[in-house]
């Protein structure tokens, strides 16, 4: 499934649908798998909630800033004049239009990037496969017990068979946990990945973090000046966000149609460009943030604390 997922959504694969959209000189109709529907729904919601600051069309800005499929980390000479929706870059819902749920329609080449929610959505999909597999196995066990009266299970075995599977999926900053006993998760210090600034407890739901510290590069403006660039952009102006250092988001399992990790992943990015109070009118979540002055904020229901 991971290969199928990347074949549809990865802008780093030459054979992906996303790459075909970026190479289509006159645009076209691009049919994605049915499983992509909820992901596109989530991007619709994030785009609206952030007033366009979260936009899959930011892929073009990332390329201009050097975060391209070749990972050149070289900023284009005219990038400053072409970044963002303010300078005419394509916009989700206008230049990329959804048709029939999972068909994207364009009229020209558009470089899209589904990284804000994509990894979290993959985690949820894998979690769904684990759950479905266990439910299918349990169903077969119960069927055998019904058709074979001599096959008896103890009370504890029956409870174990009917219980939802326990698992933790760790996708490097994106966690999905279904455990009876909460697990402790360190809040990584964005200035020093060997240290933590806090700790959280996660048991049933998703927990995602975002920070520019692990994906950043420098470009020389001149001999004296070097500009720090990272992948967390405001899609309106196309520039890397400078005021926030790290975000952490917790979302319960039932959120957004059963895609809590995708929601947490997207919100961890959205908190770089939007106020949490505005986002809370659309999404149910708890969060913590750390700004460039090391000032921490934490919501009342966040399942953790700063040191």
Predicted regions and their residues:
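Mature catalytic core of soluble alpha/beta enzymes
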Residues: 1-307
């Amino acid at each position: 499934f991971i290969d199928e997922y990347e074949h549809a959504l990865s802008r780093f694969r030459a054979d992906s649908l996303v790459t075909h959209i970026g190479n289509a000189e006159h645009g076209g109709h691009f049919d994605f798998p049915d499983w992509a529907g909820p992901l596109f729904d989530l991007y619709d919601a994030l785009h609206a909630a952030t007033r366009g600051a979260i936009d899959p069309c930011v892929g073009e800005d990332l390329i201009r800033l050097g975060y391209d499929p070749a990972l050149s980390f070289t900023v284009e000479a005219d990038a400053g004049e072409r970044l963002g929706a303010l300078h005419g870059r394509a916009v989700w819902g206008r230049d990329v239009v959804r048709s029939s749920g999972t068909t994207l329609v364009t009229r020209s080449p558009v470089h899209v990037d589904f990284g804000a929610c994509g990894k979290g959505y993959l985690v949820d999909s894998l979690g769904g496969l684990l759950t479905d597999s266990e439910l299918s196995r349990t169903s077969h066990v119960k069927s055998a017990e019904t058709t074979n009266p001599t096959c008896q299970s103890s009370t504890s075995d029956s409870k174990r068979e009917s219980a939802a599977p326990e698992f933790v999926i760790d996708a490097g900053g994106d966690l999905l946990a279904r455990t009876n006993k909460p697990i402790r998760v360190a809040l990584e210090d964005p200035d020093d990945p060997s240290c933590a600034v806090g700790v959280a407890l996660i048991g049933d739901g998703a927990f995602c973090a975002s920070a520019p510290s692990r994906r950043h590069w420098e470009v020389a403006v001149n001999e004296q000046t070097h500009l720090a660039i990272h992948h967390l952009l405001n899609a309106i102006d196309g520039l890397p966000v400078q005021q926030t250092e790290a975000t952490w988001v917790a979302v319960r399992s039932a959120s957004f149609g059963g895609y809590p990790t995708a929601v947490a992943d997207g919100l961890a990015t959205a908190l770089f460009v939007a106020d949490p109070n505005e986002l809370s009118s659309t999404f149910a979540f708890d969060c913590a943030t750390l700004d460039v002055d090391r000032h921490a904020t934490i919501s009342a229901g966040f399942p953790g604390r700063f040191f």
